[in-house]
């Protein structure tokens, strides 16, 4: 039977532990243990912090509402600071010492891929919050994810470029795991959309100036547009440099910068006209009244912004969907055992989240298609839908 997202239906009770040690109080009923390792600090904190805040906020709401099948959840969270070795260590600790029945996390592709062999060997269901397609292709029995893949992002961007007849483009990709993976995916499918890559440059995550790479791309014969692929501060630096060089070409970014923080860091003037694929969450108030994602996205946005005083981001939305997917699976499994939760999770049908409507299967551990992405443009420092 199709599952319609409802906060009231999936609320549960929980105690929280955050950071590198448990803060939760013990309880005889705190017997459903869900673990999380997130990059709440370090270079990926702009991703991991809203994820951690979202999980805490939601379990607080869950605490107030009354439980999954009359049992409590204890959420145990560690901060891996974006370090793959720490993520692997924490995943092992969550399973062996904390005895969790499921794990949410892996903020980045690098930390996620360090966690994957641990959960697969232990047989513990894991929902990743990372973007790269390699997380779920090939399909692994216990590994799922909520963000759209980098390959999907390439396809969505190339569809828009094709419509605008921007067929000769340059790439500027980060050398981090996300940037490298998305670069590979874009190179693989460009020809399917009639796109020719006439320039291919890279940047390191800590680079403070990308003028040389952008100048090289600007001077490529016939170039019509530039696509930046990356996470963190790098894409913002590239966007500022782009404006400083007054490059008269449309600029595209990836879903890796789909948050207000990108606009704030790069500046509203520099980001004017930038396009990228994003989730419904960024334009929640602009969605049609009949859009099934509108009530989910607007409710989360209002709750998160009210609780934190910060703008809701796509990344927090990934955590929102992951937690609710896991809670729904536990309810349907009717028992908090890893194998039962995994089977129920894989049988999810019609779950409406901030990223889209999710239908999972033995051959698809993401459950989203390209229509779940929205092409967005920044105008006057705000996100708007591209018609």
What residue ranges belong to the model's regions?
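Extracellular/periplasmic Venus flytrap/periplasmic-binding protein
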Residues: 89, 133-135, 141-246, 290-291, ...
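Beta-alpha junction/loop-to-helix N-cap segments that form part of ligand/metal-binding clefts
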Residues: 33, 46-53, 65-137, 146, ...
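Extracytoplasmic "Venus flytrap"
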Residues: 35-56, 78-85, 107-108, 172-180, ...
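Periplasmic-binding protein-like
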Residues: 94, 98-107, 127-129, 170-173, ...
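Sec/Tat signal peptide C-region and signal peptidase I cleavage site
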Residues: 23-30
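Bacterial N-terminal signal peptides that target proteins for export
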Residues: 2-15
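Segments of small-molecule ligand-sensing domains
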Residues: 303-316, 325-383
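Extracellular/periplasmic periplasmic-binding protein-like sensory domains
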Residues: 239-318, 382-385
């Amino acid at each position: 039977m199709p599952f319609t997202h409802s906060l009231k239906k999936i609320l549960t009770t929980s105690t929280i532990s955050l950071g590198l040690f448990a803060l939760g109080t013990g309880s005889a009923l705190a017997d459903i243990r869900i673990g999380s390792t997130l990059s709440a600090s370090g270079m990926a904190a702009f991703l991991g912090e809203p994820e951690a805040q979202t999980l805490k906020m939601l379990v607080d709401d869950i605490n107030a509402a009354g439980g999954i099948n009359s049992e409590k959840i204890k959420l145990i969270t560690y901060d891996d600071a974006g370090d793959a070795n720490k993520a692997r260590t924490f995943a092992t600790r969550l399973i062996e010492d904390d005895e969790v029945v499921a794990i949410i996390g892996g903020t980045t592709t690098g930390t996620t891929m360090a966690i994957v062999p641990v959960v697969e060997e232990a047989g513990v269901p894991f929902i990743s919050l990372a973007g790269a397609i390699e997380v779920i292709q090939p399909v692994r029995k216990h590994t799922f994810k909520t963000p759209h893949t980098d390959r999907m992002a390439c396809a969505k961007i190339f569809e828009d470029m094709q419509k605008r007849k921007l067929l000769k483009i340059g790439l500027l990709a980060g050398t981090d795991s996300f940037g490298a993976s998305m670069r590979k995916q874009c190179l693989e499918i460009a020809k399917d959309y009639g796109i020719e890559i006439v320039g291919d440059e890279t940047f390191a995550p800590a680079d403070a100036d990308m003028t040389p790479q952008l100048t090289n791309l600007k001077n490529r014969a016939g170039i019509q547009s530039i696509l930046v692929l990356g996470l963190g501060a790098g894409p913002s630096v590239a966007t500022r440099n782009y404006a400083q060089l007054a490059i008269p070409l449309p600029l595209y970014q990836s879903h890796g910068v789909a948050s207000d923080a990108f606009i704030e860091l790069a500046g509203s003037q520099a980001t004017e006209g930038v396009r990228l694929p994003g989730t419904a969450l960024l334009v929640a108030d602009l969605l049609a009244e009949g859009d099934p994602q509108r009530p989910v996205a607007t409710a989360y946005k209002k709750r998160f912004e009210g609780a934190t005083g910060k703008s809701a981001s796509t990344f927090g939305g990934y955590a929102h969907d992951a937690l609710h997917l896991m809670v729904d699976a536990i309810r349907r499994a009717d028992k908090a055992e890893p194998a039962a939760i995994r089977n129920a999770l894989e049988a999810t049908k019609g779950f409406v989240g901030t990223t889209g409507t999710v239908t999972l299967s033995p051959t698809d551990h993401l459950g989203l298609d390209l229509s779940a992405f929205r092409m967005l443009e920044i105008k006057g420092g705000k996100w708007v839908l591209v018609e």
